[in-house]
């Protein structure tokens, strides 16, 4: 006997209506490039009876429309990592999206309050909390502006600059902070807290590094696809148009967790010296003999020199070149035509082809060089990233290859490689502050680099840590001069330029919403309040007669 009486027919009809609504939703042009491995019925079964509309989905629609326009025009949305409400309100005047960096959050905003480098070892609600912080600020300043404008006449509004404070936010989901269920929960957090899009990378969660650190460990291709599917599943369950950005760190990766996915086989390094013990055994024996630190490193270096480490196709080419084979170049061409970075040939198939061409079982052991943590050695590169990006494309709105340098030729190689299979795929580019921009290119080239990338299809570009660096520079300059010349530093280097440039934060009480709150108080008290923050005696009256842009 059920606790609550329910009309089964009405329940079934409601379910079927919702399934039909989801199917209709998925027919929208926004989803024409998206692959789903489940049905609308599967999704509706996972929903509750109360459907909540999340404003972040409206922001996602706005973001998608914005990027569509950039794609048509061969332009780009370019932005940077925001730290706080000051950043987002100032960015909103000039930039059309906002980025939230896991790196910045790790160093400045962990929910544990413990600073850290970018290892994604902070509590997994850290970036969602920062997202909510900035999203609430956007909503507040939008309300404040709306209230101020509608205290004006239409003629006054026409003369008053308008700022769209609701710039879509794209946030850093790192590796998802765990398995599939963790990713689903993390995605829900981002949807609830204002994200229009999130990005997730193909590193292993326990060893995640900043994209510009060494020692990156990848997960197999299918494991990352599962993450992308998990994000879309969560977004579908919660009725969100959330954009998914798939990042690959394979360009500079050196390790892989597993050989299970044949699409990774081409890039796995093996030993070609059959007389050596596996490295892990050699290192264990050295430790048992009491060797430490430098001596252990020497043992590993000696083993590595003797191992003949290479990729399987390199071992095949070396065998053909060193052996007694007629038509060597023809043999190499036949092998490399069928086994190449984008062929997704399994090692078993590659071995069979090599034996057919050479008559030999070529020795190649990818187990022997495994590092002490158990990972396989891996040789990434641009074509490796292209191969992964092609696999991720059906499950992601945007693809991002993390790179070591701001190299246009490499960016073009990646874009061309992805678009050869997926011509309409949107791409993203990290204009990283880890690059030495003044060594990488001329000042003139710096000015046009974003536009050059946009023409290749990089529709969303961002400086991950510009919020951090601009804040550091401004505070360092002011603190140094303040120590030397006192209030002259503030008056001449901060306040005067604020007034001259029309930076509204110079009237910080008004910027923070004091007038808006006063008007709320008056609304509640019938129009009169003796405790108005901006009443007689407020010090911002000193700025009223200032001949400025404010």
From Swiss-Prot:
Kindly identify the residues recorded as the active site: 210 (proton acceptor)
Q: Where is this motif: Microbody targeting signal?
A: 548-550
Q: PROSITE patterns recorded for this chain?
A: ISOCITRATE_LYASE
Gene Ontology CC annotations of this record: glyoxysome
EC number from the UniProt entry: 4.1.3.1, 4.1.3.30
Which CDD domains does the entry mention?
ICL_PEPM
One GO MF annotation is:
methylisocitrate lyase activity
- Superkingdom of the organism of origin: Eukaryota
Q: Which residues does UniProt assign to the signal peptide?
A: none
Q: Where in the cell is it found?
A: Glyoxysome
Q: Where does Mg(2+) bind?
A: 172
Q: Where does substrate bind?
A: 101-103, 211-212, 247, 430-434, 464
So, what pathway does this thing act in?
Carbohydrate metabolism; glyoxylate cycle; (S)-malate from isocitrate: step 1/2
The record lists the catalysed reaction(s) as: D-threo-isocitrate = glyoxylate + succinate; (2S,3R)-3-hydroxybutane-1,2,3-tricarboxylate = pyruvate + succinate
The keyword Acetylation is annotated on this UniProt entry: no
The protein's required cofactors: Mg(2+)
Instruction: Alphabetically list the UniProt keywords.
Output: Glyoxylate bypass, Glyoxysome, Lyase, Magnesium, Metal-binding, Peroxisome, Tricarboxylic acid cycle
Task: Write out the function statement from the record.
Answer: Catalyzes the formation of succinate and glyoxylate from isocitrate, a key step of the glyoxylate cycle, which operates as an anaplerotic route for replenishing the tricarboxylic acid cycle. Required for growth on ethanol or acetate, but dispensable when fermentable carbon sources are available. Also acts on 2-methylisocitrate.
Family assignment from sequence similarity: Belongs to the isocitrate lyase/PEP mutase superfamily. Isocitrate lyase family.
Q: How does it assemble?
A: Homotetramer.
> Which protein is depicted?
Isocitrate lyase
Q: What is the source species?
A: Cyberlindnera jadinii (Torula yeast)
């Amino acid at each position: 006997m059920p606790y609550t009486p329910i009309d089964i027919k009405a329940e079934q009809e409601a379910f079927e209506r919702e399934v039909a609504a989801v199917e209709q939703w998925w027919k929208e042009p926004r989803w024409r490039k998206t692959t789903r491995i489940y049905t609308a019925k599967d999704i509706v079964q996972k929903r509750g009876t109360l459907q909540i509309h999340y404003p972040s989905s409206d922001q996602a629609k706005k973001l998608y429309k914005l990027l569509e326009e950039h794609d048509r025009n061969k332009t780009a949305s370019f932005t940077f990592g925001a730290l706080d409400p000051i950043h987002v309100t100032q960015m909103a005047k000039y930039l059309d999206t906002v980025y939230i960096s896991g790196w910045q959050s790790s160093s400045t905003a962990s929910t544990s309050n413990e600073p850290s480098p970018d290892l994604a070892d902070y509590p997994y609600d850290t970036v969602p909390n920062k997202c909510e912080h900035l999203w609430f600020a956007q909503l507040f300043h939008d309300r404040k502006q709306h209230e101020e404008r509608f205290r004006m006449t239409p003629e006054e509004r026409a003369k008053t600059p308008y700022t769209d404070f609701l710039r879509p936010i794209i946030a850093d989901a790192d590796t998802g902070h765990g398995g599939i269920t963790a990713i689903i929960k993390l995605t829900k957090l981002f949807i609830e807290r204002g994200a229009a899009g999130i990005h997730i990378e193909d590193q292993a969660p326990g060893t995640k590094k900043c994209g510009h650190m060494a020692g990156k460990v990848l997960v197999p291709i299918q494991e990352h696809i599962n993450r992308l599917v998990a994000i879309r599943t969560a977004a579908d369950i919660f009725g969100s148009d959330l954009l998914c950005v798939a990042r690959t760190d394979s360009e500079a990766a050196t390790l892989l967790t597993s050989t299970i996915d044949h699409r990774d086989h081409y890039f796995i390094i093996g030993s070609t010296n059959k007389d050596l013990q596996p490295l892990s055994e050699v290192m264990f024996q050295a430790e048992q003999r009491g060797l430490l630190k430098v001596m252990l490193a020497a043992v590993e270096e000696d083993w590595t020199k003797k191992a003949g480490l290479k990729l399987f196709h390199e071992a095949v080419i070396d065998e053909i070149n060193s052996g007694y084979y007629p038509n060597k170049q023809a043999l190499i061409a036949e092998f490399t035509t069928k086994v190449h970075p984008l062929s997704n040939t399994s090692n078993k198939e590659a071995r069979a082809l090599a034996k057919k061409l050479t008559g030999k079982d070529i020795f190649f052991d990818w187990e022997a060089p495994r590092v002490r943590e158990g990972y396989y050695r891996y040789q990434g590169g641009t074509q490796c990233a292209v191969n992964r990006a092609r696999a991720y494309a059906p499950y992601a709105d945007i693809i991002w290859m993390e790179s070591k340098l701001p190299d246009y030729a490499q960016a073009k190689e990646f874009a061309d490689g992805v678009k050869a299979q997926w011509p309409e795929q949107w791409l993203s580019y990290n204009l990283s502050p880890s690059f030495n921009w003044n060594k990488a290119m001329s000042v003139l080239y710096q000015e046009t680099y974003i536009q050059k990338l946009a023409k290749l299809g990089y529709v969303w570009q961002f400086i991950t840590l510009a919020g951090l660096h601009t804040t550091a520079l401004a505070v360092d300059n002011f603190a140094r001069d303040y120590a030397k010349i006192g209030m002259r530093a503030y008056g001449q280097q901060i306040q005067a330029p604020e007034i001259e440039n029309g930076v509204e934060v110079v009237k910080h009480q008004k910027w923070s919403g004091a007038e808006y709150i006063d008007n709320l108080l008056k609304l509640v008290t019938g129009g009169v309040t003796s405790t108005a923050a901006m009443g007689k005696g407020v010090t911002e009256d000193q700025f009223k007669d200032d001949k400025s842009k404010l």
